[in-house]
Amino acid sequence: MKNYLYFLLFLLGLLHPLTAQDGDFSQQSFLLGGRNSAGNSTQRSNYNPIGERADPDAAHWDIPTLDTAKDVDYLTGIEKDVILEMNKVRSDPAKYAELYIKPRFPHYNDKRYMVSETLSVLTKEGRAAAEECYNALKAMQGVQLLFPERGLALAAKDHVMDIGQKGQMSHTGSDGGNPVTRAEKYGAGYKNLGENITYGTSSGRDIVVDLLIDDGIPDRGHRDVIMLPGFTQTGVSTGAHTRYGIMCVIDYASGYVSN
């Protein structure tokens, strides 16, 4: 199964979309505010829609503070887990690297990541990408937490419902809409807006770790979005994808006010 990660960051400025295709690996790249990023493809595990929210490493974190989505009624367990994992790494990147990135090192066999004895993930860079992520996070300072925003979650859900049932992979909806138009349907006033999408990854932590390692993406644009200090709000939606089992759309903003 393929897993595609796409990155889109809207900062006040011009949008210049670039696209490329390589076999069955569809890749979109966008240049916004002077930055360029692209998508990547890896093998992923089977679809497991919603798991328990139990965290065996909870003792290492101030969960009541970091779990900003725990009381909202419009997110599933996995969607809340995505926000929790993003807040963990934003609050203490070095600790996150030690707990969740470094332990992956021994599981690489050349370009394959061994999920278990019988399941492996084909990567583009192998252990080198995880090591680069570890070193980068160790050098970062913490940034402010993300808080759930209903309008962003609704915008993300619209995109999941739209392209998921069609088996598509894109930031662009079937109606030609993009993250900005979807967000503006449910709110306004944002200062900046970003979006990450994953396909085929089925747990909150795996979604965030995959985006952080950003295997095959030279500028690690997905990691940059997660760690961008300017973002304070997020909306997450997961759902079925006819080709890859599950997909997750994560929208980010600051200054956004839901309708």
Where are these predicted regions, by residue range?
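Sec-dependent signal peptide cleavage junction
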Residues: 18-72, 103-111, 115-116, 122, ...
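Short, well-ordered surface patches within globular domains
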Residues: 72-186, 223, 229
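A well-ordered secondary-structure block
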Residues: 151-257
